[in-house]
Design a protein with these regions (language model features):
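Substrate-binding pocket helix/loop in short-chain dehydrogenase/reductase
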Residues: 98-99, 103-108
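Residue(s) in the substrate-gating loop at a strand-loop-helix junction
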Residues: 142
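Active-site helix of classical SDR
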Residues: 122, 158
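The beta1-alpha1 cofactor-binding region of Rossmann-like NAD(H)/NADP(H)-dependent oxidoreductases
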Residues: 62-72, 104
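SDR active-site lid
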Residues: 174-240
Length: 266
């Protein structure tokens, strides 16, 4: 087994379920020391108790949509955060609402969670990484970060923002000759509860699963791909059949518009 992850401090948001939970389990098995973050402290404690070398892992309950909570965590756990070798921005929230019906509150919550939360944590870990001249920042995006899709205007905007931010950060770090790896992950359909928690026009949860996700990748498969790509220091990786739409939009924009216009939501 590779020693790549041995004793690395890996901070994972959205760690209590889905891809985040799968990453926690697999990286703990590889010898990483995990900082588990999500809003569900009880679930985090339950997960941590099942990990190998459980005493080496830490729990940091966090609502990434709340700047005050983030700032309190950064102050109270400053030493721990300064030690982070790998940050995985996995926490996120999706959307199922027509643009003209979506409330401003729901749009702001999506941006706070998916963009401002991720960038706040990124800026928190960067000083330690830059001082050591080593580190990795991995952010979960979506094919919606490469093209717009019906019922996901604010979600897509948040993911486009993630791409612009981290592409710019990568260029800045490269220009400064810093050995800090930036990777964007664009998974297509993954069998998680993300659609269940997606926001409707009034900001309430959809509270039902999209049937298409049932045939998607498992979180375990997705986590394995992310880990492998991180070890190879990839800049951007794709999973699932949806990646074909990225190329269609780039080279056949008329066909792409025809495809998304005919899209029927679950």
């Amino acid at each position: 087994m590779s020693n790549f992850w041995k004793d690395k401090v890996v901070w994972i948001t959205g760690a209590s379920s889905g891809i985040g939970e799968a990453l926690v389990k697999q990286l703990a098995e590889k010898g990483a020391r995990i900082i588990l973050s999500s809003r569900n402290a009880d679930k985090l404690a339950e997960l941590k108790a099942k990990l190998p070398n459980t005493e080496e892992h830490s729990i940091l309950p966090l609502d990434v949509s709340n700047e005050n909570i983030i700032n309190q965590a950064l102050i109270s756990r400053k030493e721990l955060i300064n030690s982070v070798d790998v940050l995985i921005n996995n926490a996120g929230i999706s959307q199922r609402a027509l643009t003209w019906e979506a409330s401003r509150e729901s749009e702001r919550l999506i941006m706070e969670t998916n963009f401002f939360g991720a960038t706040a944590l990124t800026k928190a870990v960067l000083p330690g990484m830059m001082k050591r001249n080593a580190g990795s920042i991995i952010s979960l995006s979506s094919p919606a970060g490469a093209f717009g899709f019906p019922l996901r205007s604010s979600y897509s905007a948040s993911k486009h923002a993630i791409h612009g931010y981290f592409d710019s950060l990568r260029a800045e770090l490269d220009a400064a000759k810093k050995n800090i790896h930036i990777m964007l992950v664009l998974p297509g359909r993954v069998s998680t509860n993300m659609s269940y928690n997606a926001l409707k026009q009034d900001g309430s949860k959809q509270a039902e699963a999209d049937q298409r996700l049932a045939s998607g990748l498992s979180p375990d498969e997705c986590a394995k791909g992310i880990i492998k790509a991180a070890e190879k220091r990839k800049a951007e990786i794709y999973f699932g059949r949806e990646q074909i739409l990225i190329y269609i939009k780039r080279y056949l924009p008329g066909l792409f518009r025809s495809i998304v216009t005919k899209f029927k939501p679950d």
